[in-house]
């Protein structure tokens, strides 16, 4: 059946109708987004994962909108009130909120004051008010009842009828919505400063901005400050202009009509439109925050791994001591230890801690020490730097330990290290994050990784869905070693679920290393479809068939075999690679029955078998000396690593305890629309110190050389 959303999807997303249709068909056949993006490029016109997801998500939204329209139309028609004009308006509505606005007058309501007044026969009196009848009191006397015993109460009931009708008028509500959106201001004032000891919301104690210009991060800050009771948020309208517009709907005026206007405007329509606009502002702000978190997470997962290094994980603490964990080049735990390197430990204990750390470095030839950035991190860094004066071959890195404690207390960590304390597991996690960030970070709920803004204030369901998509995308783009990956990492591979991933690990434990992709088919519960979706993303480094350690899908093996025969290739040496580089893509693809995009990917994999996408990204900055905030001076040039990107700038680790802020205005000499256009999490950047605030321990940085800023 023809999908009724195709035209709209193609138009909204700037794609061809055929591309949209193909993606929806492939999805309906059970193909995953990573599989479609990597192995069906010719069919989709080379769409990437984000574009494919956008098609799928928007199709769901449009289908939900269309279903609601049909429900609303059927309900209004059942009442005998569906006009051609109303039907056309509902069918043309582009938002669910607009459909609900049009449906409002026909919606089944709970008993209201207007309902009671109508039941008491006061509708004729309401009509007389509109006609500005000269004898309203007398007419009202005739319509008194038990519910409305006096003329005044009857008139008040008639006003209620008019207020309800007037406040449900779609043209009035629509005009008011647009007026507030385009011309009103949103304000905040201080409500209770005692709830804001750190003055986090100081900027919002007396704040005002145009509704239409309010930035997403400000929306979320206003929401949080209001929720905490620190500030009061309100709108500022041109009520005089609104009143004039409403009054123009009445040919004649009287005190009762004036009451109808005031009640409709101030008690009904304005509050309803304010709620709608704040809801829309929040939704847009949440979407922006989620998108930014997703970008940051992707960058963090793609940080280049420090492969083949002996690493010591150092989880700092004051009273309970620092937990150390030595892991070998493969991430295997060698030993753990607890030392007391900082106060309140005695000088004797600190001296012993120095000896213990030095002994570990010597015994295990430690190349890098990974220090968690939590409690006691600054003091621990100074301690490590002091010890490393005797070990010029060893460096240290401050590692973002967000989520390490969450992982350490998880069932997964207990299963992996049942005999270790939570703190020692944290030290292992910190060390492994340096060796292979992706493999370690997938064990942690992405929301706990801490590279977003206001992530706890947004829709948790939507946030989880988007972050899971990012993790899945990165895992499949990088590829997974089927023989070393944890079941958690495997579960993110296209086509694999928790059960199949656990079965792969169990199969390895029982049968030893998997030696070919074909052998993967022997794993219980891994059927033909799962194999098709997963095989190309699973790597086997020591496989007999070199293709098993590439992104080449088994479905293309016969074509590659034919290509090797055609080029007389027996081994992927320099001569073979030269032949592959010299190929005419178009002619060769046609001869092999492959698409050009597929052949292009195959050649890229053959030129670099086992290549890791992350090797093209920045590695962490290695340090040996401690830098203090007091050592910095304005204009000083430094190197640093971007730790977080937010709407108003980016935070950079330059080796002092506090990350420095590069405000968006300091990112370029020209206008920057958003910080993510300039930097990403994990980037190595050259910065200049623009401000040092020792009292508040704050640091401001700039990407602009002060000598060139003018």
Q: What do these predicted ranges mean?
A:
Residues 13-17, 27-31, 40-47, 59-69, ...:
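Conserved NTP-handling cores and scaffolds of large molecular machines
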